[in-house]
């Protein structure tokens, strides 16, 4: 079968994925027409370095400080009897799911074009 892309639920998987691609002879460099596209999620300093090194095409940045702040805000809201309203928010959106409301914070796709942007949380550490 033809493999064109891999999504990793964490950048921590990239080293193992890249090793298996090499073993299978599918380790063409990022950007090469024969390359398997590799995308992950987290946006950690290590993930950004993988992009700089050409070992990962992209990652979705999940700013830990924003997640922690929003979690604290929502805990305070709910503990005081408030409810989480569905709909668009300045920093994302709240959608309804079978298990309750889900707050989806805005996320940035990081590629070689913006990997060094100072606004990325991992570049601020």
Where are these regions (language model features)?
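Short glycine-centered helix-capping/turn motifs at secondary-structure transition points
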Residues: 25-28, 54, 118-119, 123
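Hinge/cleft segment of the Venus flytrap/periplasmic-binding protein
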Residues: 69-125
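Hydrophobic alpha-helical
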Residues: 1-50
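A general structural signal for well-ordered secondary-structure junctions
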Residues: 2-3, 27, 56-57, 85, ...
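Flexible, solvent-exposed loop/hinge segments that line or gate ligand/substrate-binding clefts
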Residues: 42-43, 62, 109
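Extracellular/periplasmic ligand-binding modules, especially the Venus flytrap/periplasmic-binding
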Residues: 5, 9-21, 52, 58, ...
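A generic structural signal for alpha->beta connector loops
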Residues: 35, 55-56, 106
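Short, solvent-exposed coil/turn elements at secondary-structure transition points
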Residues: 44, 65, 113-115
